């Protein structure tokens, strides 16, 4: 494309705001103190008289004041706000085939207003117009297939302020230096896909999809603007101010492009006809091929949309620009006729004669009556010729094969060769030629069967013996493990092992002592003296338990508790093996009862102790349950 075209005309509205802030703090301190104390003294002077008369009273009051301290800290801030607004009137965007874009912007004169707010200060402010111009020129453009990258560099916006303080006037001048930034973008056509689907021989309508995304364009924007302002202010004398200046600035440039294109093509299928004519009498033949093609038309349309946006400290909008291109391509196919000469060929009939002759049949006569023999001490071997009819799918013949038979002398007196013909297949004859055929059919199968039977019997007996040995070994091992567990892992053995007297050793000693009663008695006495578990179940040999400690002194307020405790102990500890745990725990939880720190032996319960009379003990035993009933 070499023609120039104007994409569109866009009207933009842009707003720029500059804010300056000045802060001037001031503080004041006030103090006040007041203290107040009031003290009063009264004196009573007694006098003689009747009881109904009141005695005179003298009082003295002394006030003292203390003032509290109050501190006030006041801080005042002076702020100056400077704002500037500029509006973009028009913007024109033009492009050509050489990929150079020029952007021009025109701003109308802007009015800047300044305001200063300070306590006890009068301000006279003046306004000044401001104009700015910017030019944007495209440097170069390229199409690449790399990933879209964005690189931008911007120089900071600098501002300088100079202030002059005097008792009567303040002069402030400012200048805004030029700033420039460059933005580089890469545009590339990402993907291209073509789909043709000619499926029928009549009409072909392929679809073509063209996808592209622009990712590289580079252009440089330079902006130069100057701001100058001055004003005269009247300020009260003897004022010192420190001002902080902040100048926020931001810029954003956004450009979005959309490209879409479509290709539609319509093709008519070409019809090809072939005709040939062959003449036996002519000297040549002609083959003509005619091709009929319908013109093919194709149309390509594409559209593009570009949305540029340039926002320095504000937002800007632009109208979408759309361009469409369409082109039509026509393809014409020419008809062609092809002629070729083929030399004639004369077919001469040929006659073939096939003669078949039958396979000659030979007749052989075998003398089967001739028999020869040889013998040893026990066996006679007969040799003769056996007639075989060998039959196959395509061949049949008769032959005689020598045969040997071994017969015991005691079993046969005379032998005659068989005169019948045996029918066999070709494999039998092949085995006889190889020497692998066993002619002695009477002895072979019996010898083979005998070896198989003997081997199976021996293997079965050996397998049964091995299984029996394995089962016996497992049973013996399990019995030993169970016996060891009973001896070493019982409850009594565990207690004896902790105290140094295992029960396993005692059981072995008892079995040895049973042979000699005298030695058994002496060993038992020795063991009872050394083994603390020898008299474990001999209750008569035990000594009397220590006396029960007296109960604690309980006040009269705990009488109900004593009755409750006695009733509770009568019901819960009436069995033979009642423990003193109930007494100790119940007494320790309240004021009464016994001490938990006392080391008492096992209590047998009320009515079973030694300090109770015989009649009372019998009464309690009759009313209480027995040990066997308790276990059940």
UniProtKB/Swiss-Prot annotation:
It is found in: Vacuole membrane. This is Topoisomerase I damage affected protein 7. Keywords: Glycoprotein, Isopeptide bond, Membrane, Phosphoprotein, Transmembrane, Transmembrane helix, Ubl conjugation, Vacuole. The keyword Ubl conjugation applies. Glycans are attached at residues 4, 253, 488, 553, 558, 622. Its main location: membrane. The modification Phosphoserine is found at residue 624. Residues 1-18, 506-537 have a biased composition (Polar residues). It is a single-pass membrane protein. The chain crosses the membrane at residues 453-473. It comes from the Eukaryota. There is a cross-link at residue 508 (Glycyl lysine isopeptide (Lys-Gly) (interchain with G-Cter in ubiquitin)). It comes from Saccharomyces cerevisiae (strain Lalvin EC1118 / Prise de mousse) (Baker's yeast). Residues 1-33, 87-109, 236-267, 295-322, 335-359, 506-551 are annotated as: Disordered.
